[in-house]
């Protein structure tokens, strides 16, 4: 069956949820985006699992389509057993973490990390992250 297209009513940020049980989705305006949509010069990952430890952030690459989506891949995404957090502008006044490996976010906790080479995605609007193990 072809479900057809869904319409985005206006430019902005949205949350998209899909229920795999009943095959229905919801698309809602992300109201907090306007209030917290600060633009950061840099976002990095830091912690005992990163190349720079807790002393230096490993810079993520900003997305070409959104100033709030960041990524990391390749040799700089080789992480070791330990913990990590994301932070803005190489400072601690704005930082994000989570309590779960691989995905989560929006808390101040340290993210548990297992040794692997990863592809990492991070969203600075809500602090969500996705860390995909990518052993080569």
Region spans (language model):
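Insoluble glucan recognition modules
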Residues: 1-136
